[in-house]
């Protein structure tokens, strides 16, 4: 195949215009037959309000008289080159017989893709998820948003699909993976029901509503491949002798002990009771830096006009944004989990704690844009340096946040936040939320240095996106679960200091988001496959 980069066309272009551009760049005869596939599509707004789509495409020539090499040479362009697609290959099995099925604790993206890879290699994993299957979980979450009644086991954080199920389903990642794992993740999502556009969109997203359906299809496939799913069940203990795993224990009344030589800890970033258990069991762990802040809402129309340079009269998706700033005090302030056309959601998972997140459906059709504007925190902010210090810091913020809103999402306009004043009414636009809200002061939740950094960050972002620091921008408190506050150490073989236990994904400190967690799950599965061969009785 031939790859063409940097095909630039107006956003209103037709399919025929793209074909003509391919013919022109390859200097083909108009009668030459060819097929093409989009590899990458991104919006170029650098000359706004003139907007363009930029494409990379793979072209297959049907005319065998002209070799691809000859066509590339004739094109005489650095944007035209020979293309060979990287196909992901599961590694060959190792030599050590594994006669007890591997256990995966957690059915988020890391756990699911670890299970998917293991199942494809014949390992028939047992997946144990503390939360409910996604069908029941969706009902539990909706009930919580409507009534405030929290199910500590089945909520926005816990349950099949992981915390990312109730976000935007964003799939972009900064992970560079030449082995084809990133492509495998996207193709697998499409295989189980996601829109094929995620394969080439520069900012791919599935949407909460579609992602739930994809997860069900993926689970059913894995069951057909020999995997077992155990829901509403938490791994609460490990049997370890001489630094070697012998079995896992769960809080189930039936068959609470599962003998195994391999356990993948695909924990979410909110599995605090499991972190405690692992710490007390002697796992090598360390606290790490993360970030906290507030979910900030603006009118989506304002963001579109700023990013696109026009009032959105032509068909364009709701615009995302990404903003970042660093200050002399060493703090970074940046946007996180930006949700175009989204909702602020109550994503609490513990009684008497309040935490928020952002969410979008596939069509991203709410009137507001939101993102977390967060401030970096490091172990020095925790006042301690043990592995669980960051967890305790999160809990402190979340319990105080709960008190501010009396269990509801506390909100304050940015202007009132700057003036340390209670908000009494929204400004020119209202909030789009899932979960009940109340006006409350958010001042003092972060320390003075962090709060000042947040204000300066908002002001700086106002120079980048007109209106970002408007006084009626809506702040919702607090966003504390941006990433895991700790890391469970592992060696080059992906094992912890306990033989047979493999820390994996976001909760273990090795990923940040759906795609990177899924890739890490695949990597851990590969390590297991390379070491063992299935030999189940």
Give each language-model segment a name.
Residues 3-53, 58-166, 170-537:
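Residues forming the flavin
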């Amino acid at each position: 195949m031939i790859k063409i980069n940097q095909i630039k066309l107006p956003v209103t272009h037709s399919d025929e215009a793209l074909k003509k551009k391919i013919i022109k760049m390859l200097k083909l005869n108009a009668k030459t037959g060819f097929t093409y596939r989009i590899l990458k599509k991104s919006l170029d707004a650098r000359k706004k309000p003139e907007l363009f789509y930029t494409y990379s495409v793979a072209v297959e020539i049907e005319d065998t008289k002209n070799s691809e090499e000859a066509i590339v040479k004739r094109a005489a362009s650095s944007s035209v080159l020979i293309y060979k697609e990287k196909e992901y290959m599961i590694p060959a099995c190792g030599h050590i017989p594994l006669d007890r099925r591997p256990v995966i604790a957690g059915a988020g993206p890391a756990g699911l893709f670890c299970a998917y890879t293991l199942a494809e290699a014949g390992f028939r994993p047992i997946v144990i998820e503390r939360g409910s299957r996604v069908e029941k979980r969706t009902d539990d979450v909706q009930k919580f948003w409507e009534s405030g009644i929290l199910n500590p086991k089945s909520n926005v954080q816990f349950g099949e699909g992981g915390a990312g199920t109730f976000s935007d389903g964003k799939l972009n990642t900064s992970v560079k993976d030449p082995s084809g794992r990133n492509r495998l993740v996207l193709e697998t999502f499409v295989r189980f029901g996601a829109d094929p556009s995620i394969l080439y969109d520069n900012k791919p997203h599935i949407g909460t509503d579609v992602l739930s359906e994809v997860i069900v299809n993926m689970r059913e496939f894995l069951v057909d491949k020999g995997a077992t799913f155990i829901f509403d069940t938490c791994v609460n203990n490990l049997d370890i002798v001489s630094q070697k795993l012998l079995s896992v224990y769960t809080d189930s009344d039936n068959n609470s002990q599962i003998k195994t030589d391999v356990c993948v800890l695909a924990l979410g970033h909110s599995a605090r009771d499991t972190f405690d258990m692992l710490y007390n069991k002697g796992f090598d762990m360390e606290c790490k830096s993360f970030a906290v802040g507030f979910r900030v809402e603006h009118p989506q129309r304002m963001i579109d006009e700023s990013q696109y340079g026009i009032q959105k009269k032509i068909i364009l998706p709701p615009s995302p944004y990404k903003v970042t700033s660093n200050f002399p005090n060493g703090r970074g302030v940046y946007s996180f989990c930006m949700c175009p056309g989204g909702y602020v959601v109550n994503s609490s998972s513990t009684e008497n704690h309040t935490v928020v997140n952002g969410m979008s459906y596939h069509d991203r059709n709410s009137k507001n844009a939101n993102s977390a504007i967060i401030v970096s925190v490091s172990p020095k902010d925790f006042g301690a340096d043990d592995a669980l210090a960051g967890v305790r810091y999160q809990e402190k913020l979340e319990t105080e946040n709960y008190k501010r809103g009396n269990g509801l999402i506390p909100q304050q306009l940015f202007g009132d936040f700057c003036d340390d004043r209670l908000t009494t009414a929204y400004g020119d636009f209202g909030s789009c939320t899932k979960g009940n809200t109340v006006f409350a002061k958010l001042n003092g939740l972060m320390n003075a240095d962090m709060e000042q950094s947040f204000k300066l960050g908002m002001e700086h972002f106002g120079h980048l996106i007109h209106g970002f620091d408007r006084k009626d921008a809506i702040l919702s408190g607090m966003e504390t679960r941006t990433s895991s506050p700790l890391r469970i150490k592992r060696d080059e073989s992906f094992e912890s200091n306990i033989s047979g236990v493999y820390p994996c994904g976001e909760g273990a400190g090795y990923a940040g988001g759906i795609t990177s967690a899924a890739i890490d799950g695949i990597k851990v599965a590969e390590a297991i496959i390379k070491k063992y061969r299935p030999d189940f009785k």
